């Protein structure tokens, strides 16, 4: 999985490789996660003229901090036309999208969700109390994430009965592992983590169900 965040060229025999349907990309702030996700979208879209990718993101954030393109990529390439940006403001919008996923006549080859965890920050910025006055904001957030991931998981499993489709989402994590790891592991088989490696360099490690790969990259200008 790690190489698909960097290369736009499909690897030889790539169609025969086992790919998990859901992948999480977790790393610290300003580690190039959005750029890696967009590079992944380019990789999928470049593999075939029939491939389409839906890139779900916050409009203001993507416009103020657009993803970087790797060297050698032609910004005027037709492949960009096969990547559709879908602007979503809250977690309900993500659930509505996947609830209607089975109605799509032309299913995308991949769905990418940038800053997935940020769609649930409203639960941490407001105080939600139960009948006894106990703070319930963290629990409400966890339940909303579970509902969203479950809906996404079921939608992708159903879609793969018709054609190959996968979901890759990212989250910002200041520590060594995703903040909601116990939730993600229930629904997502492959978790790719990013760690700083000094001087603007980062180490990306992908842990799948049967393999582990790593890659080093830099976003220093």
What are these model-predicted stretches?
Residues 1-221:
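N-terminal regions of ATP-driven nucleic-acid and macromolecular assemblies
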């Amino acid at each position: 999985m790690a190489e698909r965040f960097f290369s736009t060229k499909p690897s030889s025999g790539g169609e025969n490789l086992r790919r998990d349907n859901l992948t999480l990309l977790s790393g610290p702030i300003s580690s190039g996660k959005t750029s890696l996700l967009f590079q992944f979208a380019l990789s999928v879209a470049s593999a075939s003229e029939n491939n389409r990718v839906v890139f779900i993101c916050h409009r203001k954030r993507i416009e103020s901090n657009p993803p970087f393109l790797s060297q050698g990529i032609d910004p005027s390439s037709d492949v960009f036309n096969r990547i559709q940006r879908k602007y979503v403001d809250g977690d309900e919008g993500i659930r509505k999208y996947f609830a209607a996923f089975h109605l799509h006549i032309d299913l995308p080859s991949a769905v990418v969700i940038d800053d997935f965890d940020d769609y649930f920050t409203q639960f941490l910025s407001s105080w939600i109390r139960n009948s006894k006055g106990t703070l319930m904001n963290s629990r409400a957030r966890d339940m909303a994430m579970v509902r969203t991931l479950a809906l996404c998981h079921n939608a992708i499993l159903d879609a793969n009965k018709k054609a190959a489709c996968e979901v890759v989402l990212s989250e910002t994590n200041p520590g060594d592992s995703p903040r909601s790891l116990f939730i993600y592991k229930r629904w997502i088989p492959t978790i790719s983590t990013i760690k700083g490696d000094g001087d603007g360099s980062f180490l990306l490690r992908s842990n799948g169900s049967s393999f582990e790969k790593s890659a080093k990259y830099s976003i220093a200008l």
